[in-house]
A protein has these predicted regions:
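Terminal ABC-like ATPase head and other globular end-domains that cap long coiled-coil arms
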Residues: 1-140
Length: 140
């Protein structure tokens, strides 16, 4: 029984360490990608609990010229860019050979679409992107 409890403690300890390391890298990536997509501002992830293995994650975003806010209070385009920033932050940890994006640019205005396309072009050195879009800027 002692060996089993010891093994469980070791697994929990390693899980906490790996989850914290991954969270820190994703948070750093998210903090870099968000201003690149928004042309400024800042964003971060916050663990909502004391115990990382039981904790949730809250997304805090501050688009340029706005106050820190929860993702729920953002406009449709701001939500799309924030979510894209987070997905790409996760994607950078373990990039796949291809990525399918289905109309993620639909709620974006032209300047945001151009920044989004610029980031995708940069990331396309490692990953092939397949788009479903109606946006002419994205098609170019």
């Amino acid at each position: 029984m002692t060996t089993l409890e010891s093994a469980i403690r070791q697994i929990d300890r390693e899980s906490r360490e790996l989850l914290q390391q991954t969270f820190d890298v994703v948070n750093a990536n998210f903090g870099k990608l968000f201003p690149a997509l928004f042309g400024g501002g800042q964003a971060r992830l916050i663990l909502t609990g004391e115990e990382i293995l039981d904790s949730g994650v809250q997304v805090i975003a501050q688009p340029p010229g706005k106050r820190n806010t929860s993702i729920h209070l953002l406009s449709g385009g701001e939500k799309a860019l924030t979510a894209t920033s987070l997905v790409f932050a996760l994607f950078q940890i373990n990039p796949a050979p291809f990525c399918l994006l289905d109309e993620v640019d639909a709620p974006l205005d032209d300047p945001n679409t151009e920044r989004f396309c610029k980031l995708v072009r940069q990331m396309s050195a490692q990953t092939q992107f397949l788009f479903i879009t109606h946006n002419k800027i994205t098609m170019e």
